[in-house]
């Protein structure tokens, strides 16, 4: 991707190239929530926090509801969204209004950072699909564009199925396959002369 081709990547996945060896981002898929002339913000969607679930968060925050539906599973993993503000929650979900701090990312996805959404989890008021993350990934002005030029990432249009339903260990390759790339066939030295 050349510099003059880079446009707004909101509602795209960044798929780490095999050459990216930083343990925070190796084989990661980042969902871009915001991208503008001041930088970019995204959530890693395939790096779960070990032994940490949505249920764990609700218990730790002492959030209970009398409307809790026992048939709704709360054992979903919590993801390490990135190295920034990793003590703060970010919830990607299918559109649903009524929360204190939500932003529409696309017609299929919103992000909410207010605690009131946590009170709906496991109840009939919960958004249809959710992905809970601690922390986020951020890029300053021009930083993401430079990383794309350097082939650190490939950018692909986001897919709600991958975001919410694809098994975690398949997301890296599944996201790349959106544009016909099989990451398992790529060498970690790709792009080096």
From Swiss-Prot:
Enumerate the Pfam families for this protein: DUF179 (PF02622)
Task: Kindly give the Gene3D superfamilies that the UniProt entry links to this protein.
Answer: VC0467-like, VC0467-like domains
Extract the signal peptide range: none
Kindly give the InterPro entries that the UniProt entry links to this protein: AlgH-like
Q: What GO terms fall under cellular component here? A: cytosol
What family classification does the UniProt entry report for this protein? Belongs to the UPF0301 (AlgH) family.
Instruction: Please identify the protein, giving its name as recorded.
Output: UPF0301 protein Bfl251
Higher taxonomy? Bacteria, Pseudomonadati, Pseudomonadota, Gammaproteobacteria, Enterobacterales
